[in-house]
Amino acid sequence: MYQFNFILSPLDQFEIRDLFSLNANVLGNIHLSITNIGLYLSIGLLLTLGYHLLAANNKIIPNNWSISQEAIYATVHSIVINQLNPTKGQLYFPFIYALFIFILVNNLIGMVPYSFASTSHFILTFSMSFTIVLGATFLGLQRHGLKFFSLFVPSGCPLGLLPLLVLIEFISYLSRNVSLGLRLAANILSGHMLLSILSGFTYNIMTSGILFFFLGLIPLAFIIAFSGLELAIAFIQAQVFVVLTCSYIKDGLDLH
């Protein structure tokens, strides 16, 4: 007999659940589990590979998959070139492109009804932001040594204000770890919660009677329009994330 678990709270859709678990008595008691976030990240990886396989054709007339992939490639390439430069940017372009595709695909998967929005989880976005900022910091230290800390010293500031301004710059630099991941997760989380609340509200109205069914078409139209906005946000947030990533890498390379 099947058991259906209805979503009673807008936050239930973001709960991480075990889909399959196994206790293995190998090297001690090892608990292996597959969660919904792991499953959807794997689905995102498979979709990304499938998309690039469909786009990889050598025909004179490209198909729609190739055109869309070339558009994404050109967009990310222009971001890298503008934020870094044509020479240094080529070295970091594969990482930035993979990061953009990863975020975009998982944002779009979250738009599918009854799916799981992986990028709405702070544990995932904070892991990415901490890794990126830490990598940019190591890059700056490797390239400039102790001169890297001049990044926290504003040029032309009075000597009396120097300790305070250095402290402010240092706190601002540390906050990148939080702000980069927080921006992505908060936008995806808030949008999905609002859609969930509006959908439940519209469903209750339209199932209350014939008259209310037609009245419910008004919020239903708003939900459709807001879904289009969420689709645009999925692209925008992926772009913002890689733009800021390029900016942090540039700070490590050029100290400004």
Swiss-Prot record:
Organism: Emericella nidulans (Aspergillus nidulans)
Subcellular location, record wording: Mitochondrion inner membrane
Protein name, per record: ATP synthase subunit a
UniProt propeptide residues: 1-8
Topological type in the membrane: Multi-pass membrane protein
PROSITE patterns: ATPASE_A (PS00449)
Coiled coil: none
Entry keyword set: ATP synthesis, CF(0), Hydrogen ion transport, Ion transport, Membrane, Mitochondrion, Mitochondrion inner membrane, Transmembrane, Transmembrane helix, Transport
The organism's taxonomic lineage, starting at the top: Eukaryota, Fungi, Dikarya, Ascomycota, Pezizomycotina
One MF annotation (Gene Ontology) recorded for this entry: proton-transporting ATP synthase activity, rotational mechanism
Gene for this chain: atp6
Main location, first listed in the record: mitochondrion
Lineage top rank: taxon: Eukaryota
